[in-house]
């Protein structure tokens, strides 16, 4: 569900705040469901939401993915909100926060039955 606060940020065309809220949703909901919903909403209203990929290094060695790498990538996302970085970060978050995401999915399943 997209919050009223997020909708207000998008309506105000506040790119920085919108990007920060999107970034934060990676950690709040590591299933990425919230991020995907928020991104869909924002990209439909903010044509300048995405930037070009800056070409900076992306850690592709899965064995090195940990919270430190994830946090570095989250910080970089705010200033380089590119589709390339988002796609990479989705993979990193899915791996690093795999346990947390599983707990959330289980809870959602239990609540829906």
Language-model-derived ranges and their functions:
Residues 36-38, 50-56, 71-72, 107-110:
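Short, charged low-complexity intrinsically disordered segments located at boundaries
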Residues 3, 19-51:
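Short, charge-rich amphipathic alpha-helical segments embedded
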Residues 43-65:
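Alpha-helical linker/edge segments of TPR/alpha-solenoid repeat scaffolds
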Residues 15-16:
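TPR-repeat structural position
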Residues 83-113:
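Eukaryotic intrinsically disordered, low-complexity regions
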Residues 69, 73-77:
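Charge-dense, extended regions
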